[in-house]
Amino acid sequence: MIIIGHPWISSPKFCKVFSAADIKKSKAEDIVLLEPLVDSHTLASHCRQNQISFAVTVNTLQEAIFANALGATYMVCEEDDALIIQPIAQEYLFDTRVLTLIHEEKEITKIARSGIDGVIFPEAIC
């Protein structure tokens, strides 16, 4: 299970960007976070063409399918959406990992039992 943003575990920062200029300002070790996909698909293509790791927030299965097709490293979603997306991601062998946004450590076990790829704490998002 992937755990991002917990103080015990070293993990990259996910930095929100809204333009190609923001992407250029980001650190090489950061994961570029695009949101929402409908407004950032050109930035996703830019990241893919330039081999920049990126994540995208998704709210629907359709957005998740597009995020994977665009080459996102991660997709970030709420638990309810993750429960719908994860089985499809496994069935179609998505390269993109599904992360659920959580606020408390005790939620990790519940997400793990649901078979979701991982969790991300808000502290990991800048």
Please place each PLM-identified region on the residue numbering.
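Active-site-adjacent beta->alpha loops and helix N-cap segments on the catalytic face
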Residues: L34-C47, C77-F94, K106, C126
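Glycine-rich beta-to-alpha transition loops that act as phosphate-gripper elements at the mouths
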Residues: P36-L37, F54-L61, E79, V98-E107
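Conserved N-terminal beta1-alpha1 strand-loop-helix module at the mouth
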Residues: M1-A69
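Extreme N-terminal leader/targeting regions
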Residues: M1-I2, D117, I125
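Catalytic cores of alpha/beta
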Residues: L61-L70, H103-D117, F121
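Glycine-enriched alpha-helix->loop->beta-strand junction motifs that scaffold or abut catalytic
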Residues: R48-S53, L70-M75, D95, R113-V119
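Solvent-exposed alpha-helices and their adjacent loops that cap or buttress functional pockets
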Residues: K25-S26, E91-Y92, A112-R113
